[in-house]
Amino acid sequence: MFHLLRRLLSGDTVTRENAHYKVCAIYDTETCNYRTADGWIAYPVLFIVNDLRSVDLADYVYNESDNVFFYRHGQEFVEYVHNLVSWGKRNRITPIIAAYNLMFDLQPVIALLAASYDMEVNAQSSTNVYTLDLMQDGKCVLRFWDAFHLDMRGLSAMGDVCGLPKATGSWDYDLIRTPETELTAKELYYAARDVQVIPAYLKYLLDANEWMQSDMFGFRIITKTSIVRQMAKNKLYKLRYRKGNGKRASIGFSYDRMCDRQSPKTFDVYALRKTCFRGGFTFTSANNASKVVDNVASLDVTSMHHAFINGRYLPCDFHKVAPATLQRICESIINTDLVSVLSQYHKPLWHGVHVRIRFDNLRIKAGSAFDAWQIALIPMSKFKLYENGEYEESESKRFAETHVKLSGWHDNALDPVFAFGKLYSARECTLHLTELELWCLSRVYEWDNMRVILGEATAHFSRPPDYVTAQSHYLYELKNEMKDVCKRYDEKPLDCSRYTKLDAPIIAGLETGIYTKDFVQSYYQSTVKGMFNGIYGVQAQDVYKPVYTVENGHIHVDEDSAVTEWTFAEKAKDNKSKVLYNYGMRIVGGSRMHLVIAIELLYRSLDNRVSVLAGDTDSLKIRCDVDVTDNELLQALKPLHKAITKAIDITSERLRNTQPAVASTLDNVGCFEVEKCGNFNRYAYHMEAWNKARVSIDTDAKVHVTCAGLSRPAGAYTIETFIEDLLDTNAPADVLPLALGYNVFIPHAIAHALEHSQPDIDDTVDMYITDYLGNTSRVQAHKSIALYPAGRMLGDTSKRANAYNLRYVDVDTSLKVLEPAGDGKDAHVTYMNGDVLL
């Protein structure tokens, strides 16, 4: 206290540690796109600020609490920032300015801010940050926070959740404006609404979570995952249990200790474990790709990751082992039969390993389900020369992966055959595997010789930490309670005596009937299910990936922060993150094993009466003969259902005994269910194109498309509309391979895609522009990011990953264009020269 008083009297500013954070403003911009001879550019025409420095977000009231300012030039907004910084210093507050898609709105002013402040950043990529701090004398004096990470579905979805819908239709983005263009009252209303949705959403979060405080926003609560972290810390961390020695400890403290004990102690161990990590099992059956089939069932696993958060013992205390010993351990793993695995599904194998193994003549296992349907397991993305990642990843994560690979830690293959993002065969390959992945490998592939090169192993297994399983149990029960509320609530007072997990503010709102049904549904779908689904992500984080730095306003990966064998010890000592990476590997590894076993059981029981077409982490698409019933599908999977239910009961026994107030029965977790396909349990027609790209037609002739890059705005003409139009006069077998095929160009009128130009922060506009009112003025501003309409090219075979698929599919690879219906013309498919194909 004396030191703080002395510094205050001397006029020193207050440090980050004793100046509290407060959301003081919400920020947004409106920009104008302008077509030049060199392409699209954009510049800002309006800066919007909702000043909330005198408002407690817990008491926020739409319109009453708002204090909205409009600025037409970037320097005016920067002056506002300067004034807010000065106010924060006087009041011992670190102000936070929140925005949605922050870097889009900071683009035209970041160079101006960089002229006055140093900057520090916590980022996912150079264009997607969590927070950006303005620094003076090494101290944070203002923080920008991107609220996008609380709900990534858009401001409109955020507004729907909190009951303040985003304004639509009042700002015509096709009109040319300048900073001097007079704006209408409707346009200003539209612009203001975006800076009102965020405080309304934050108010909603405070009302929905009794433990949450407004000073957590932008500090302790930055992302949806951090909401889960803080919920656990405030509601569960201090729950106590009695240890074997009779002493009592909190489950949170025990978890922290376990994270410290199980963290890698050397760079080699870190790199080995990182290289062993696999994502969810996403695959396409090469034998069935781009083929239209009928009578397709969709099977989903109930809460797949939670099955292995709660149903799998964790290998602990790894140590390096000689290759000869590892060889014997690995041979025992691959010789473990399916019956043994299912009988001890909580601990299916007797050893845990992280190993590097060389295989000779690796190929799909003859006579297996994976041979019958040509399904492969090993991801192409783990190999050193793979250029385009199978999944979108952050620059930091890609840099960490590349750096580890350059250090020699990567899979490699000689004469490999790749397709659909997977390795089908290789004359020789070196793989990095856990015990779960090695066992799965033995079910999918066969080989002539296997030689273990190096690795670590353990025979010690323990239950997963109660701190994490308690989160899963608690949120599963909360999810079920809210699901029940959604069925019962009709905007009248509701008897809530049956509910034990709902927070008091939610109970109060339900019992008085003040909530709308839309609010209740949004709370269930967005908040409760969002938190439930966020638990796994915490354990899968690489806490040693490099960070981002800012130089003169330019954000980039700090290459010096990448861990190496020379810097690892120092970085490990400084690391305070509590993540159990081995646990995350076993959670996702369990999900991969679950799908592998399911495929094998379906083949054993139903043989060629079914075909597994594709899978995605927790789901399978299965073509069925017309006489295959739902009951037959589930009976084939019954051994797996019994195994996971028993595994969860064994693994969760301690938590249920010591923490009954938060424990759950976890009914049906890990079990497959046959999903509705429209009004029936089968799709009439279905086609898998490649991973995560599929089209289905239900029995009511409604089309369902899943494909990255193809938006489906409500009420718009979309790819689904286009296919329905073609199906009026053509058969599914003719339409689907062309609509979702290789080298198919889909124009903006169908794809509704946007491209963007990313100017440098120093790029400026200085030109005379005539606005839509006919007024000409000189525009001098830093450039904004230009968003402009664009089409999408599907299955571009000039890209290596797509070209590899052609080994297995017989399709038309000529360039084609989808032409939408309109202006008296029917929908059709043409070649690039204009000839009509369909």
Please place each PLM-identified region on the residue numbering.
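Conserved acidic
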Residues: 18-20, 35-838
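Conserved Rossmann-like nucleotide-cofactor binding loop
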Residues: 32
